[in-house]
Amino acid sequence: WANVENSVVLTEKGHICIGIQEWNGVVAAEFLQKVGYLEELTTLDMIKLFSCFTNIRVSDDVKTGYKQHKFTGNTLEYHIDELQTIYNKYNDLEVKHELNTGLEYEIHYDLLPYMEDWVTADDEQQCSRVLRLLEKDKTIFVGEFVKALLKIQTIGLELEKVAEDINHIELLKRLREIPDAILKYVVTTQSLYI
């Protein structure tokens, strides 16, 4: 909130914060402002980034990091570093002051190696191959992956509204490419359970 000419006005950070439900809105607002509203990320990089918020659970022995991997690249790695720093900052504040805001501070990197293959898959066989790899490598089944992709789409839709509110047209354009990139094969907006 800001006091402008004796009236209370919601700041840009506040607009972002209230527009985000699928991941931590406080973290999202600071992160988006710090990294210039994802201007350096491609649509594919945004999809990979959003996959970190999908609440996929895998066994500790198959968990994936993100540092220095071919599927991350320097730009995305920088963004994830910044995101992790901001997450840690707010989590530490909650712990220090014994707060329980109910906000989530958990992110994962287990889908990062598979998102590019999914996005670039052109046919049923390539999509099926990605699904088999997810099951074999991570014990992530089709239904879980469908839910994860739908969550990525929802995050994109939330950010579309935020981008419209704060007039970030270039971000809006790239966000609108997400559904076409991820909703294919067994995954559609109508997918509830496979």
Feature map (PLM): residue ranges:
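Detector for Asparagine
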Residues: N3-N6, N24, N55, N74, ...
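Accessory beta->alpha helical hairpin/"wing" motif in late/C-terminal subdomains of nucleic-acid enzymes
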Residues: N3-Y37
